[in-house]
């Protein structure tokens, strides 16, 4: 089973799954250098260095370099995208949503990345995306290789006016894209201002 974890953060959505399922091979993408380092340490400590591969790349719908915005508190909010201007209204009290600096990172479309780094992969069994405002861009960046994806999850704002980042996709845009490309949204889980859309390929 091939698992992709785009925006792996601390590995909360992939380390345990990979450890407890010896048939899983995970490709984790995390552009924050310190988090990527900790993921590699965790994978080695759990004895799965050969099945848990960490790439310090950002994933989107273009290839090249871009500014990756680092944040003060919540490292899970670091993003290629800038924060929206109305966060004091839509996310009251979240003073940790403050950029502390930016660094240039390598950005890949997933179809390009697969061709360069893992051309042997022909099926992605599960694609977990938490790319902080770029989730739909990650899917679009698969191009024709989107047909390889069997299931996955993307994060979306619950309402258009609750977008955390400038230019972020809407929930409806994500739902429309999934339907147009042969997926069914089979579950939604919610957290503050955001929903996780789980999807599977139509049979």
Question: Language-model segments: what does each one mean?
Answer:
Residues 1-203:
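Phosphate/nucleotide-binding beta-alpha loop and adjacent structural elements of enzyme active sites
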């Amino acid at each position: 089973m091939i698992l992709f974890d785009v925006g792996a953060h601390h590995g909360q959505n992939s380390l345990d799954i990979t450890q407890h399922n010896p048939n899983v091979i995970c490709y984790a993408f995390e552009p924050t250098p310190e988090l990527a380092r900790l993921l590699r340490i965790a994978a080695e400590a759990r004895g799965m260095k050969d099945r848990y591969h960490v790439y310090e790349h950002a994933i989107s719908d273009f290839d090249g370099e871009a500014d990756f915005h680092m944040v003060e508190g919540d490292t899970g909010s670091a993003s290629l995208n800038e924060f929206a201007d109305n966060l004091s209204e839509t996310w009251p009290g979240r003073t940790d949503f403050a950029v502390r600096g930016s660094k240039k990172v390598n950005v890949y479309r997933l179809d390009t990345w697969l061709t360069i780094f893992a051309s042997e992969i022909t099926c992605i069994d599960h694609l977990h995306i938490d790319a902080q405002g770029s989730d739909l861009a990650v899917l679009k960046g698969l191009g024709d290789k989107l047909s390889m994806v069997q299931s996955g999850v993307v994060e979306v704002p619950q309402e258009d006016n609750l977008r955390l980042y400038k230019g972020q996709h809407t929930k409806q845009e994500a739902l429309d894209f999934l339907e147009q490309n042969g997926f069914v949204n089979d579950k939604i889980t919610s957290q503050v201002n955001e929903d996780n859309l789980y999807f599977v390929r139509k049979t």
